[in-house]
């Protein structure tokens, strides 16, 4: 399955300003906080998690939370994602691929989940 999401970076900036750290910890794991260099990278992580939820066909909600998905970087700095063990079993996930890009004030992510 494929999931794609686009987020306006200014929208993330506004939410961060309004809700402060509550906003960040609503969807970031502690391991992901270090990845946030600016609002564009924060928006990229948000888009990646939304795209991952769409690739599973369930969205963020009762079956899957933002905190069930971890975004990290490999040795070359490329973004990767993994789901927690319960989600891997529930959706029979075998492999994942992630791409994040930024352009024109937007963060865009595409995720492929193989079962």
UniProtKB/Swiss-Prot annotation:
Q: Name one GO biological process term.
A: fatty acid biosynthetic process
The family this protein is said to belong to: Belongs to the P-Pant transferase superfamily. AcpS family.
What's the superkingdom here? Answer: Bacteria
Q: Which gene encodes it?
A: acpS
Give the EC class as a word.
transferase
Q: Which UniProt keywords apply?
A: Cytoplasm, Fatty acid biosynthesis, Fatty acid metabolism, Lipid biosynthesis, Lipid metabolism, Magnesium, Metal-binding, Transferase
Tell me if Magnesium is a UniProt keyword of this record.
yes
Q: Where does Mg(2+) bind?
A: 5, 50
Q: What function is annotated for this protein?
A: Transfers the 4'-phosphopantetheine moiety from coenzyme A to a Ser of acyl-carrier-protein.
Compartments in which it is found:
Cytoplasm
GO terms for cellular component: cytoplasm
An example Pfam family from this entry, by short name, is ACPS
Known EC number: 2.7.8.7
Q: What is this protein called?
A: Holo-[acyl-carrier-protein] synthase
- Which co-factors does it depend on? Mg(2+)
